[in-house]
């Protein structure tokens, strides 16, 4: 029987797992935003067809794209998401006590819920606007 594996969300606390997401990352050599430095700053690579350099913090879920070779990932992260608790962690994942880890992961879970809630709210508002417009068009026919 092999060693138990961590849930995917917890695997992302390990830098090497974050680095492994940077397949086809455009900035590899002679750049400030290499996969290693991006991972150190908490980012994972989640490219889309229109945003091949899209990176997201696994902890605060802030998405950034439009990276330039000289961008400093930690500074960009601080600039766009200064309240991210991951930026203030001074220990490696393996060095955290269970209590420290659970407290940290509770913050990550709160961030995830907030991002998902905001996304659903935006989706609801867009649908409501379309329905409202359709109702107004029907009312105009009367």
Swiss-Prot record:
One of its GO terms (biological process) is negative regulation of apoptotic process. This is Baculoviral IAP repeat-containing protein 5. The lineage of its organism: Eukaryota, Metazoa, Chordata, Craniata, Vertebrata. One of its GO terms (cellular component) is chromosome, centromeric region. The modification Phosphothreonine is found at residues 34, 48, 117. PANTHER family: BACULOVIRAL IAP REPEAT-CONTAINING PROTEIN 5 (PTHR46771:SF3), DETERIN (PTHR46771). Zn(2+) binds at residues 57, 60, 77, 84. It comes from Cavia porcellus (Guinea pig). Changing residue 96 to A: Disrupts nuclear export and loss of cytoprotection. Monomer or homodimer. Exists as a homodimer in the apo state and as a monomer in the CPC-bound state. The monomer protects cells against apoptosis more efficiently than the dimer. Only the dimeric form is capable of enhancing tubulin stability in cells. When phosphorylated, interacts with LAMTOR5/HBXIP; the resulting complex binds pro-CASP9, as well as active CASP9, but much less efficiently. GO terms for molecular function: cysteine-type endopeptidase inhibitor activity; metal ion binding. The gene is BIRC5. SUPFAM superfamilies: Inhibitor of apoptosis (IAP) repeat.
